[in-house]
Amino acid sequence: MKVSELFMPTMKETPSDAEIESHKLMLRSGFMRQLSSGIYVYLPLGYRVLRKIENIVREEMDRAGAQEVHMSALMPKELWEESGRWAVFGPEMFKIKDRNEREYCLGPTHEEAFTYIVRNEVTSYRDLPKILYQIQTKFRDERRPRFGVMRCREFTMKDAYSFDMNEEGLDISYKKMYDAYVRIFKRCGLDVKIVEADTGAMGGSNSHEFMVPSSVGEAEIAYCKACGYAANLEKAECLDEPVENTEEIKQMQEVYTPNVRTIEELVNFLNIDAKRFVKTMIYRADDKFVAVLVRGDREVNETKLKNLLKANELELANAEDVERITGAKVGFAGPVGLSIEIYADNEVKYLKNFVVGSNKTDYHIKNVNLSDFKVTKFADLRNITQDDLCPKCLSQKVTIERGIEVGHIFKLGTKYTEAFNCVYTDEKGEKKLMIMGCYGIGINRTAAAIIEQMHDEDGIIWPITVAPYEVIVVPVNIKDEQQSKIAFEIYEDLQKKGVEVLIDDRDERAGVKFKDADLIGIPFRVTIGRKIADGRIEVRNRRTKESVEVDIESAVEFILNLINEEKARYKV
């Protein structure tokens, strides 16, 4: 492809609304343009990258025995009512009506459609197991689209669904997908951490996320360098460590704390360590209110709380509800005398003579103990921190860092097959529910995550497996007849050898061409300049920044060897 003919509108300046490197570079390199908030158009270079990622995904899905289908992005309300998710999925679902007032949604995910099809077409144990997948556009009405394609309203996903006769079969399908994901991300050049995850709105019993460590990631992950344990912050377990407390029980004492609401303010005002406080947080869980207790230096893990309560919706109570329930303004809630259910983190079990809110504005109570109020249930309800030991090996404190989720796999069990009565007839003629798994990869997110992990001050450093082109040939002066002739000869020879190659035939300064080549991240740049008088050209590796001069006669063979060596880095 000639660069003079390529639709590649690169930008010198970084758009002011682009916050992270992948967003900046995808715009600057001419890979995409924004059509509206959270909606992007992919231009030729960007679309080539997406197609290459899709092809890697497709090859590994096929290798794992999955079969590709294509579902409709538009789905009728009735499907989602059958699963029970029409009302509970939330405002992220795009809902529309046709001219006859029939309701539909633009699919944020496709469990319903796949289960419906399999229910109607698979009836016997002889037809199982099955793993079906698609690479399809998804839609989610994000409240605040941001970070380019990391959180957008329209995106491409590979979603696969397995259907098995029993849990043992699901384990096999799950392992196949797990292994396929490891291969996919290796081939894409990504360094991923595989972490235990919460199943969230998808439901099910077990889940893993494939996370790319990045300071701009929206999720936090905790992992142990000693044993390899890894989980996202929502899922990471906190040890219930019994602590012997020999303090004598003291008499409760109300203290005046005018306008002192936060733990930090209380620590300074009362000169008491944060670990001696118990925070009381009031939550609305669906249609009821509950109180949650955690130690003063801890934070409530809302995912753990939501799972414990089996709630569809969970949010902090507003100031008006807090005052109605506690009789006090926000910042002074406490467990003593509360009429709603109280759930407490396990750590609270081992505290004595702690400080809580008084349920009276501007007052707290010292020397409160568990006998002074009733706890409905103790559970692990806090976020793990870097001061906590690994819950598996107990030998080292965990490390916490941010990450970008590029893949997520779930053991769904019978959540959807039960809702849809998706059954098969076993060898004894009995009807049994199929067991499901669900497996997703964000194609656009994967591209952005690669950029976040592989870029420098000059631009993108694409792994050769997903780069839009493998080589760019750059004649320094296109008007120089000899340079132009040799450049086109090398370009055409590489094309004949099956290499994906660009030639920058623009009448531009060499510096402009070099900057664009680095910006768009082509793995190898072949420069044809004045040294052709000595029969030599330059080949530069974008990843290593190493440049080598080679004889013109052996240049094509040399470049082919470099390409093969680079591809070998990503083989599985």
From Swiss-Prot:
PROSITE patterns: AA_TRNA_LIGASE_II. Keywords: Aminoacyl-tRNA synthetase, ATP-binding, Cytoplasm, Ligase, Nucleotide-binding, Protein biosynthesis. This is Proline--tRNA ligase. HAMAP family: Pro_tRNA_synth_type1 (MF_01569). It comes from Caldicellulosiruptor saccharolyticus (strain ATCC 43494 / DSM 8903 / Tp8T 6331). Consists of three domains: the N-terminal catalytic domain, the editing domain and the C-terminal anticodon-binding domain. GO terms for molecular function: aminoacyl-tRNA deacylase activity; ATP binding; catalytic activity, acting on a protein; proline-tRNA ligase activity; transferase activity. It is an enzyme of class 6 (ligase). NCBIfam families: PRK09194.1 (NF006625), proS_fam_II (TIGR00409). Its main location: cytoplasm. GO terms for cellular component: cytosol. It catalyses: tRNA(Pro) + L-proline + ATP = L-prolyl-tRNA(Pro) + AMP + diphosphate. GO terms for biological process: prolyl-tRNA aminoacylation. InterPro entries: aa-tRNA-synt_IIb (IPR002314), aa-tRNA-synth_II (IPR006195), aa-tRNA-synth_II/BPL/LPL (IPR045864), Anticodon-bd (IPR004154), Anticodon-bd_dom_sf (IPR036621), Pro-tRNA-ligase_IIa (IPR002316), Pro-tRNA-synth_IIa_bac-type (IPR004500), Pro-tRNA-Synthase_IIa_type1 (IPR023717). The lineage of its organism: Bacteria, Bacillati, Bacillota, Bacillota incertae sedis, Caldicellulosiruptorales.
